[in-house]
Amino acid sequence: MTALFVVGAIVSVGVLYVLLPVVVGAYRTFRGTRLVTCPETQESAAVEVDARRAALMAALGGTELRLQDCSRWPERQACGQECLQQIEAAPDECLVRTILSRWYGEQVCALCGAPFEAIESWGHRTALLAPGGQTIEWSAVRSEKLTAVLATHQPVCWNCHVAESFRQQHPELVTERPSLH
């Protein structure tokens, strides 16, 4: 009984050693919201791949992807999911966080001129300056509208976003002073 238990434990550890990196790698590759062009409507759509299923399929040696969510659902839920070809071709390129990192990485804050080092998906988030002068966190923008919003808005750092939001929400508490420069 003990020898059988030891052999079983060794086999289990070996299987985990081989499969765990494959499963974790597939899960990390396919998690997160992505922007794709819907083949049916030719418009931007925000989709999420079923990352758990992708990880399980990777463990079994397959690469079959399925959508878990789409901004076009429930109206177009019966679609053929042809947009998955875009994700398979470039899984990182269509990730919302990749799109945002590249966009912010090429710019400086519209209000203070500070360069952006990295965007955060939690904590002190970067923001956007609307043409009307209001700032909003990028996380408040619906993913499928992100491309259009990035074309019309300017980047704002967390510090300027907080200061601007306070100034807009409580103008009676703010004294405008002329710049010393």
PLM regions with names:
Residues M1-A9:
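Feature marks short, highly hydrophobic, charge-poor N-terminal signal-anchor/signal peptide-like helices
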Residues G14-E43:
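Transmembrane-cytosolic junction motif
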Residues R31-R34, R66, R102-E106, L150-H153:
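Short metal-coordination and nucleic-acid-contact micro-motifs, chiefly zinc-binding Cys/His arrays
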Residues T37-A78:
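Acidic, Ser/Thr-rich low-complexity segments on the non-lumenal side of membrane proteins
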Residues C38, L67-C70, C109-C112, Q154-C160:
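Short cysteine-rich clusters marking metal-coordination/redox-active sites
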Residues Q42-A45, P74-Q77, C83, I87, ...:
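Cys/His-rich microdomains that often coordinate metals
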Residues A51-G62, Q85-D92, R97-R102, H124-W138, ...:
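Short cysteine/histidine-rich metal-coordination sites, predominantly Zn2+-binding motifs
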Residues W138-H181:
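Long, non-transmembrane cytosolic or organellar matrix-exposed soluble domains/tails
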